[in-house]
Structure formats: C-alpha cells, structure tokens
C-alpha cells in the first residue's frame, strides 16, 4: 500500500451545536448518512451533549477524508456519501456509497480514520491508501529549500 493522501480536521463542538439549533436539526440530516443518523438520534436521546459530540466527530471526519482524497467537498465527495461507523470494539471505519464508492474503487483507495472529542473540540485524522501497483496516488510535491 502507498499513501494516497492525508487529511485532518478540528471542529468546535459549540459551533456544531449552534448550527444544529439554528437549522432545527436539518444540519444533521444534511451531513450524516443513514446509519450515522440512527446513531446520532440514539445518542442524542440519551444525552444531548453526546449526540452533539457524535455529530461534530462525523462532520470532522468527513472534512478530513475529503482532504485526504484531495477533492475537498466536491463531487463525488458529498456529506452523505461517506459514513464513519464503529466496529464493536469502538474502532472507527469509513464506508463510502454511490459515486464516491465507485470513484474510490477505480483508484484502489482505502482509508483509515481516527476521531476524538473533548468537551470543546472534535478532531479527526484520515490516511487514504492505494494499492502500490496503481498509479492513482498524486505525485509528491518537492520540498523547496531557501538559500541561507
């Protein structure tokens, strides 16, 4: 495997909460995929703070993923096309659907994700990898040197 790209993002939980309140919950429906949305509602029913933290981590993970694949939030990367779910052990993993899944498969791209949150912030880091046999990875950018 070769690294295709890396991405990181940090989200301020209070800003996510404010957007959620201002939109009457539509923000969660816009950003979360169907499986994420079910988890969000279940967590929010038990604890408003945990529900908002979950939404913030998923928002952050999508932003980090979009950076790792080099597209930002542009087709085929859409909010609902990527979900960050958890194995029973708690380890997060990403699941792509639709045109994003096709785009990733055509390039042999897989990804590893980690998310973390505290009271004020949620942070995510994504490493996108591709098969070493493919030419999908973007060329590395040489580091410039300044003369002293």
Curated annotation (Swiss-Prot):
Q: Reaction(s) catalyzed by this protein? A: apo-[ACP] + CoA = holo-[ACP] + adenosine 3',5'-bisphosphate + H(+)
- Protein's name according to its UniProt entry: Holo-[acyl-carrier-protein] synthase
Q: One short Pfam family name for this protein?
A: ACPS
Q: What does this protein do?
A: Transfers the 4'-phosphopantetheine moiety from coenzyme A to a Ser of acyl-carrier-protein.
EC number(s) given by UniProt: 2.7.8.7
Q: Which family does it belong to?
A: Belongs to the P-Pant transferase superfamily. AcpS family.
Q: Name one GO biological process term.
A: fatty acid biosynthetic process
Keywords attached to this entry: Cytoplasm, Fatty acid biosynthesis, Fatty acid metabolism, Lipid biosynthesis, Lipid metabolism, Magnesium, Metal-binding, Transferase
Q: Which residues form the signal peptide?
A: none
Organism this protein belongs to: Burkholderia cenocepacia (strain HI2424)
Q: Which HAMAP family match?
A: AcpS
List where the protein spans the membrane.
Answer: none
Any idea where this protein resides? Cytoplasm
Q: What would be one Gene Ontology cellular-component term for the protein?
A: cytoplasm
Q: Which InterPro entries match?
A: 4-PPantetheinyl_Trfase_dom, 4-PPantetheinyl_Trfase_dom_sf, ACPS, Ppantetheine-prot_Trfase_dom
Q: Which SUPFAM superfamilies match?
A: 4'-phosphopantetheinyl transferase
Provide the organism lineage as a comma list. Answer: Bacteria, Pseudomonadati, Pseudomonadota, Betaproteobacteria, Burkholderiales
Per UniProt, where does Mg(2+) bind? 9, 63
Cofactor(s) the protein needs: Mg(2+)
A Gene Ontology molecular-function term?
holo-[acyl-carrier-protein] synthase activity
Keyword Oxidoreductase listed: no
């Amino acid at each position: 495997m070769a690294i295709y790209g890396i991405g990181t993002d940090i989200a301020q939980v209070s800003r996510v909460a404010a957007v959620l309140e201002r939109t009457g919950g539509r923000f969660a429906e816009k950003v979360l995929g169907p499986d994420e949305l079910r988890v969000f509602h279940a967590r929010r029913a038990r604890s408003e703070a945990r529900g908002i933290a979950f939404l913030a981590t998923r928002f952050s993970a999508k932003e980090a993923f979009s950076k790792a694949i080099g597209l930002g939030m542009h087709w085929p990367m859409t909010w609902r096309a990527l979900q960050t779910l958890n194995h029973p052990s708690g380890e997060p993993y990403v699941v792509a659907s639709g045109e994003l899944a096709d785009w990733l498969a055509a390039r042999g791209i897989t990804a590893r994700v980690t998310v973390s949150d505290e009271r004020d912030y949620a942070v995510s880091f994504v490493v996108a990898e591709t098969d070493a046999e493919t030419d999908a990875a973007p060329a590395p950018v040489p580091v410039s040197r300044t003369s002293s």
